[in-house]
Amino acid sequence: RIGIGANDNSAAVYQVIKWAQKLNTQLDFHNIRIIFTDGEEIGFDSENKNFQGALGIASIFKRLGLTNDDIYAIDSCGRGDVLVVSSTGKNSGSKDFTKKFNNLYENTIELAKKSCPEKWVTIPVPYSDNASFVAMGIPAIAITLLPKTEATSYMRELQKNHNLNNDVVNRSETSKDILPLTWKMMHTDQDCIENLTIESWSVMENFLDALAKDKSLA
């Protein structure tokens, strides 16, 4: 792998660890389960006959019947001041799946409005571990960050070209040029500490705190 992965995904790991410490010391009750995963680039481990990364966890969740939790993939959250709620996954399955996904999606939008007023967007995100859960028929939402200028430019392109949404989700070659710079930095030597932004930490702290206080029942 090229680069140190400062944004993808060291920043989010650090943010979630700090959040876990707060959950443990400052809240009398919460219904949060935190799972860290790695090795998604490996894919299927043919020697041990199992999936790596989030796909392995998603397959276990499905086998155990854990399909009603609100699942979030916290991914690449160290650069930017705008919270991004991924719309990727909508209309990806049966009517039952779509209903559950839309309920989770709308609840996430409400959390974004409360925690990051006027500093959030919802757009298609062509990466993140929520895709593994969606592939297993389990609704999951990706949460990430972008600088305001990049988020605004990307949204304008989506508004100009209504086919672009599908191109992004399917990772079409035609969509690569319009993707935000932050995403283009992933897996390159530009994914470094120097390209992280200090304001990202407060944005994520606000969202994660709102998520902990939500206490929605699965």
Language-model-detected regions and their locations in the chain:
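Hydrophobic residues within well-ordered alpha-helices
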Residues: F133-V134
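Short hydrophobic alpha-helical runs that function as membrane-insertion/retention elements
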Residues: I141-T144
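Glycine-rich beta-alpha junction loops
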Residues: D75-G78, L146-E150
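His/Asp/Glu-rich mid-to-C-terminal helical/loop segments that flank catalytic regions of hydrolases
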Residues: E150-A218
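Short catalytic/ligand-gating loop segments at beta-alpha or beta-beta junctions
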Residues: E110-S128, P147
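Structured lumen-facing ectodomains of secretory-pathway proteins
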Residues: Y105-I109, T197
